[in-house]
């Protein structure tokens, strides 16, 4: 065995060669690297930001959002897009379902004039476009809606009734292998919206599964299960849904946390409603009977009045949000939604 100084010298030479060939920082000792706060894109619901543990969707990662139909999956993704744009970021939306509603997106705060939109014909085309956009290094967030609609070219060009076993799963596996490393280098958040299917003949456990094979389950750093749990009514009219999101996988913080918030029809996630819920939970807002108070000042009688007060007084809402995030110790990287961490230039 070589002497310790010789081994150290050999290692230093190897590291110098790697840095020269692949760029500075390609290999480093873990202790050398300063701890970097996770840069995030806020979701629009403080309850969900808290459940994620870092204050939003982590940048440079793959996110999967799945659930039943009309549960609020696209709404969650569009709010993240709006927040990324608000911080000066560039967003793209790959509309494989050909169902994006520009009016609704605008109501949620998305700058539709600046949003990059693609409506591809095949799954291969959709993922190739997504890959090229990510490799540009200019994007902050890209949404693929949805995995189930990424139909392989062979299936589109084939006859009805033809068997195409495993084609979509292989397509997703190849795309994610190519994209994951690039996402990390460019700091782009990739949100894949997915649908649910049921496995036949399952006797025990949940028969529900997501489309597109197992690759997305493995590559996703965060998986969100979105469910509609009740309807919100104004008299007899249904005006929105109460939504529950479970963080079923989380590589950046503790998983299995849940968040509940209101999605109002035509308006999206109620940010003020979410602030009230979490504020009461954390004893920052006081609830006495039907009255809500904050630091001795009355917000209103009933949740709707309190929500209206916060909407009309954004400075109070921002103050409550800041106190919640400080108390729970999350959201340190939320302010850097557009910039992300300092990353070395990468030649693709």
From Swiss-Prot:
Where primarily located? cytoplasm
Query: Where in the cell is the protein located?
Result: Cytoplasm
Organism in which the protein naturally occurs: Salinispora tropica (strain ATCC BAA-916 / DSM 44818 / JCM 13857 / NBRC 105044 / CNB-440)
> What GO MF annotations does this protein's record show?
ATP binding; ATP hydrolysis activity; ATP-dependent DNA damage sensor activity; damaged DNA binding; single-stranded DNA binding
> What domain of life does the UniProt record list for this protein's source?
Bacteria
Biological process annotations from GO: DNA recombination; DNA repair; SOS response
Name the family the entry cites.
Answer: Belongs to the RecA family.
Q: Which InterPro entries match?
A: AAA+_ATPase, DNA_recomb/repair_RecA, DNA_recomb/repair_RecA_CS, P-loop_NTPase, RecA-like_C, RecA-like_N, RecA_ATP-bd, RecA_C_sf
Q: Does the keyword GTP-binding apply?
A: no
Keywords tagged on the record = ATP-binding, Cytoplasm, DNA damage, DNA recombination, DNA repair, DNA-binding, Nucleotide-binding, SOS response
List residues binding ATP.
67-74
Pfam families (alphabetical): RecA (PF00154), RecA_C (PF21096)
Which SMART domains does the record associate with it? AAA (SM00382)
Q: What does this protein do?
A: Can catalyze the hydrolysis of ATP in the presence of single-stranded DNA, the ATP-dependent uptake of single-stranded DNA by duplex DNA, and the ATP-dependent hybridization of homologous single-stranded DNAs. It interacts with LexA causing its activation and leading to its autocatalytic cleavage.
| Protein name (database record) | Protein RecA
Q: Name one GO cellular component term.
A: cytosol
